[in-house]
């Protein structure tokens, strides 16, 4: 019997014999630069579901999925400095003869036969299995095949109108039932099973314990099997806390490695090629990621000081988060900038020289096999993971533990930071939809809607009563700070004409009971009014049903509350982001069809709904939203129709 080789002894836990992991693994997934036989093992574990709808074909929202690796190209003059030195180190696979006569891959060696040095060897060896390439999917399916309940926590909201997709909110617990695809997993939440984007969730470290928050209700037989499995694999509370502490430390070290690769591998090379990148372009693409790298290095040092290597469950790391909670505010700027960075990168990637350049940067830095947009997404994901990690750590920290109070305070602090950033991201995504909506409105007058507003709160039809007692049926859109009034086209009910707006900052909402209103001297039903604080002018509105009126009253109250919250949190959208959203919407509106006599026809209006303010996946199978209107008031016949019949080119 042959003894284990040094390479086998140094192999990380969870890896096949001899398959030594050379590089750390990203928290955003991906594949290793070096070969692995885990793919075959994963395929053997996967079971085909009995009957499930097809997997969604669109890209994962709100950010596109991590791009596939660019194929090698012939490098041009834009090749980063130093790439020629990569070829001097000939990377070879040294083969070890196993006991069964086969060959197994071992460590990489250079030309002189010595092993390459790398700073994260200990990290790779000590990392949990889910940090290994393909290890997360493999670990999930192993647990599922063994009858365990696998739970994941949502990082972001996922709102969808597709029945084939699972909707949830940040912090919700999802039971994972299948993870055969790296982008889409099959899971259960609130008694519903459907597909959901894998990048939206964080796999729980301690999967042995069935989540108390899980809304799934397994049968008695499944419950008995899960109970036996928990008794078989469950560890004590100290071990559970150890698992969470190790996850925080391991992922933090890997995260620092990715930030270093971005700063040294991409930014440094870009600055050397002034002919390809301007200072403004680099600021747009990378934002303040160098400041984040500097901050995270200090934060990791603080964590290392508090980390008890011998007994990790005794580590007291809560104070590290509390001492640095103000520093985490720099993530807000980065997350605000990230959508613009994606647009700038997408424009550059249309040119081959930029694709070659960024791939060459990755190879020169010996980074893992993920495109640049995947690396730039890591800070956005990281700041959303902290509250989930701290929540799980708090769960396994007893009140008698010396770190309990600090962990509890740190959890609340990081949750507030993540909520603020999530809200900013949601608003940034909504302004594009609002800009496209404005472009679709015919005859828009005055300032752009984005000059004052960034969120649609409610919309619907109301009857406006004028001073003369006339009723006007209008479609109203309530944004933060303003209420926009539109009129439907007589022929095309999906086309809207701009009719005016009210400044909600100057209005006072008054609920009216059914009966005669003294201001207008009219009998009204399901009515409310807005009174100007400066001019005392009264605007009277009537809803079709009492339920509609109640929704409008609640929406007006929500509008005032959100405006106040945005003011307290300093929630502002930059002028550049607003201008960019309007510019993109106007470009998208060009080239539309023209009506009779070369009169431009506005694009069909698609009513915005408050649900659209979050991450929306709109499948093609969902029909266009129907608009149910109130009855049009009768009008006298007009000469217009007689003239129209003579001019129209269409004949029966």
Swiss-Prot record:
Q: Where is this region: Disordered?
A: 1-24, 81-108, 209-235
InterPro entries for this protein? DBL_dom_sf, DH_dom, PH-like_dom_sf, PH_domain, SH3-like_dom_sf, SH3_domain, SOS1_NGEF_PH
- Tissues where this protein is expressed: Expressed at high levels in the placenta, spleen and kidney, at moderate levels in lung, small intestine, liver, brain and heart, and at low levels in skeletal muscle. Expression is aberrantly enhanced in most colorectal tumors.
Gene3D superfamilies referenced in this protein's UniProt entry, alphabetically: Dbl homology (DH) domain, Pleckstrin-homology domain (PH domain)/Phosphotyrosine-binding domain (PTB), SH3 Domains
Keyword Metal-binding among record annotations: no
Biological process (GO) annotations held by this record are: cell migration; filopodium assembly; lamellipodium assembly; regulation of cell migration; regulation of small GTPase mediated signal transduction
Q: Name one Pfam family in it.
A: SH3_1
Where the record annotates domain SH3, the positions are 147-206
Q: Which residues form the PH domain?
A: 455-561
Where in the cell is the protein located?
A: Cytoplasm; Cell projection, Filopodium; Cell projection, Lamellipodium; Cell projection, Ruffle membrane
Q: Indicate where the modification Phosphoserine is found in the sequence.
A: 78, 114
Keyword Membrane in annotation = yes
Q: Check the record and name the PROSITE patterns matching this protein.
A: DH_2, PH_DOMAIN, SH3
Which intervals of the chain are annotated as region ABR (APC-binding region) domain? 98-150
| Disulfide-bond pairs as recorded | none
Coiled-coil boundaries: none
Question: What GO cellular component term, any one, is given?
Answer: lamellipodium
Question: What domain of life does the UniProt record list for this protein's source?
Answer: Eukaryota
Recorded GO MF terms: guanyl-nucleotide exchange factor activity; identical protein binding
On assembly, the entry states: Interacts (via ABR and SH3 domain) with APC. The binding of APC enhances its GEF activity by relieving it from an autoinhibitory conformation, in which the ABR and SH3 domains are associated with the C-terminal tail. Interacts (via C-terminal tail) with PPP1R9B (via C-terminus). Interacts with RAC1.
What does it do?
A: Acts as a guanine nucleotide exchange factor (GEF) for RHOA, RAC1 and CDC42 GTPases. Regulates cell migration and adhesion assembly and disassembly through a RAC1, PI3K, RHOA and AKT1-dependent mechanism. Increases both RAC1 and CDC42 activity, but decreases the amount of active RHOA. Required for MMP9 up-regulation via the JNK signaling pathway in colorectal tumor cells. Involved in tumor angiogenesis and may play a role in intestinal adenoma formation and tumor progression.
Name of the protein:
Spermatogenesis-associated protein 13
Q: Which organism's genome codes for this protein?
A: Homo sapiens (Human)
């Amino acid at each position: 019997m042959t003894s284990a080789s040094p390479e086998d002894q140094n192999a990380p836990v969870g890896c096949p014999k001899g398959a030594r992991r050379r590089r750390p693994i990203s928290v955003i997934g991906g594949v290793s630069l070096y070969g692995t036989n885990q793919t075959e093992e994963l395929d053997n574990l996967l079971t085909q579901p009995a009957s499930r709808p097809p997997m969604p074909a669109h890209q994962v929202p709100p950010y596109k999925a991590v791009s596939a690796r660019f194929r090698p190209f012939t490098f041009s003059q834009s090749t980063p400095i130093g790439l020629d030195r990569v070829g001097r180190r000939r990377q070879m696979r040294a083969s070890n003869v196993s006991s069964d006569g086969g060959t197994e891959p071992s460590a990489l060696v250079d030309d002189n036969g010595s092993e390459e040095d790398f700073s994260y060897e200990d990290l790779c060896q000590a990392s949990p299995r889910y940090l290994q390439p393909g290890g997360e999917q493999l670990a999930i399916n192993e647990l599922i095949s063994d009858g365990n309940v696998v739970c994941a926590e949502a990082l972001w909201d996922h709102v969808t109108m597709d029945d084939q997709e699972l909707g949830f909110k940040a912090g919700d617990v999802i039971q994972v039932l299948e993870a055969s695809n790296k982008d889409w997993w099959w899971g259960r939440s609130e008694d519903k099973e459907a597909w959901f984007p894998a990048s939206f969730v964080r796999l729980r470290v301690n999967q042995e314990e069935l989540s108390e928050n899980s809304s799934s209700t397994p049968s008695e037989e499944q419950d008995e099997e899960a109970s036996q499995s928990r008794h078989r694999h469950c560890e004590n509370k100290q071990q559970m806390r150890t698992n969470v502490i190790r996850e925080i430390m391991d992922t933090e070290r890997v995260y620092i490695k990715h930030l270093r690769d971005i700063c040294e591998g991409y930014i440094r090379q870009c600055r050397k090629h002034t002919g390809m990148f301007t200072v403004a372009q680099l600021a747009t693409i990378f934002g303040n990621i160098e400041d984040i790298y500097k901050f995270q290095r200090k934060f990791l040092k603080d964590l290392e000081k508090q980390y008890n290597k011998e007994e990790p469950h005794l580590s007291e790391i809560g104070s590290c988060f509390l001492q640095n909670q103000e520093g985490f505010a720099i993530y807000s700027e980065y997350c605000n900038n990230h959508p613009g960075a994606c647009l700038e990168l997408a424009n550059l990637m249309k040119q081959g020289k930029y694709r070659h350049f960024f791939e060459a940067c990755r190879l020169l830095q010996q980074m893992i096999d993920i495109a640049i947009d995947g690396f730039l997404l890591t800070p956005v994901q990281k700041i959303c993971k902290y509250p989930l990690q701290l929540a799980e750590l708090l769960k396994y920290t007893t009140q008698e533990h010396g770190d309990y109070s600090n962990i509890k305070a740190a959890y609340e602090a990081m949750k507030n930071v993540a909520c603020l950033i999530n809200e900013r991201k949601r608003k940034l995504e909504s302004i594009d939809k609002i800009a496209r909506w404005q472009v679709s409105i015919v005859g828009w007058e005055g300032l752009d809607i984005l000059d004052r507003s960034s969120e649609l709160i409610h919309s619907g039809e109301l009857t406006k009563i004028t001073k003369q007692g006339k009723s006007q049926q209008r479609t109203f859109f309530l944004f933060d700070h303003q209420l926009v009034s539109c009129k439907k086209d007589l022929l095309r009910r999906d086309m809207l004409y701009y009719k005016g707006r009210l400044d909600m900052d100057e209005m006072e909402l008054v609920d009216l009971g059914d009966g005669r209103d003294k201001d207008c001297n009219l009998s009204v039903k399901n009515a409310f009014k807005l009174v100007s604080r400066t001019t005392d002018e009264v605007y009277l509105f009537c809803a079709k049903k009492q339920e509609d009126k109640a929704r409008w009253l609640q929406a007006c109250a929500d509008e005032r509350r959100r405006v106040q919250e945005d003011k307290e949190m300093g929630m502002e959208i930059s002028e550049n982001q607003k201008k960019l959203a309007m510019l993109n919407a106007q470009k998208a509106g060009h080239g539309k069809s023209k009506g009779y006599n070369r009169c431009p026809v506005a694009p069909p209006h698609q009513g915005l709904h408050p649900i659209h303010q979050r991450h929306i996946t709109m499948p093609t199978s969902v029909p266009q939203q129907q608009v149910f209107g109130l009855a049009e008031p009768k009008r006298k016949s007009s000469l217009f129709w007689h003239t129209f019949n003579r001019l129209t080119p269409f004949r029966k």
